Every structure is written in structure tokens, then in C-alpha cells.
Amino acid sequence: MGKVSVRLFLNDGYEAPPEEEDLFIDMHSEEYCGMISRSLLQLGNPYRIRKAIEKSKAGKEVTLAYIGGSITQGAGAIPIHTECYAYKSFQLFQNRFSTQNNVRFIKAGVGGTPSELGMIRFDRDVLREGERPDIVVIEFAVNDEGDETKGVCYESLVRKVLKLPWKPAVVLLFSVFANDWNLQERLRPVGDLYDLPMVSILNAVTPQFSLKCGEGRI
């Protein structure tokens, strides 16, 4: 029997790294819990998220949607569709808050796209065929560097989602570039204004890069 291996690469400046053996990570360690704690910039008003969780626990269908750039698409993840942060967090939500197979997943990540295009893609890639997501994660903290509006398009996308008739929850995710840079200082005021949950990968992982084993590195 023949065996074929297929590996996908994104044509946006990213290359998938070689596969490495996963090291054991103690998710109850002080270091790990500290990293997770640093990632939460703001809890915000949890009402809409709580409603989605209650809906899922009641056995009703809940949809999680993710829109962003190549990081949301899965750049660097192997396999790209099941090891990306979007799918992993969807799985975690499903395992924690679902008593049956009632949680659905939409991934609308496209490499190299800013929130200016995200405003258009949201209709095409998320709301397609009458979809009504209950939670929407927005990730453009790397791709919006060239945004001439300096955050106006980003806020417009956030407002567009918040104003949907069924009132989905919105989570702002601030990913980080390879040189420890992102745009969370520009975009965070949007989350402050609308009292939204905000998660910073920059705050969570960059302190780890200078640590050695035995110094709290995870």
C-alpha cells in the first residue's frame, strides 16, 4: 500500500517549522499559571460569553468563529487545521462547556489580510449561509501595521460584530510577531471602550524567551 504525506505551506512569508518532539508541560505549575495570568489584559463584561456558555451547557447549538490573519489561519502549526490556536481553543470550549456534540467551529483566517479587509471578509467568510456565531475572536494585532486609519477599520469591525441582532460575544486577541512586536497599544483602547475581553500573546510568552531551563521557562 502506498503512503503519501502532504504538507501545506502559506505563501505569506511564513514557513512551517520542522516537527519537534513535544516536551511535557505541567499546566498546574506556578510558571504556567503565571503565563496564563499575564495573557489576560482585561476580563471585560463577561455577560455575552456567559450566555454562550449557558447555551452550550443546555445542549443548544453554539458556534465559535475566528477571524484574522495568518496566525488565525494556522501559520507554523502542523497540521495547520488541527494544531492552530483557533481549533485548540474551540476544542477546549467544547470539552469544558458541552455535554454533547453541539459546538460548531468557523475559522476565517487569511494570511496577510488586515482588519480593513476583515470588515468585508466577515460577511463572506463568517456569516456565510446564514451563520450566527455566538462568540467571535478577532485577531489583527500583527497585520494592521499598514492601516492608514490607525485603528478606525479595526473598531468598525468590532462594532459591526457587536451590533449583530443576536448579540454575539467578542474577544480581542493580540498575537505577536517574531520580533516581539504587535499593535496592542494601538488597538487596546477599542477593547477598553467597549469593555471587551482581551488576550495578549505578547504579554504571555515574550518574558519566556529570555529564560533558561530551571529559571521558570516552560
Map each language-model feature to its residues.
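N-terminal secretory targeting modules
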Residues: M1-I67, T72-I80, Q91, N95-N102, ...
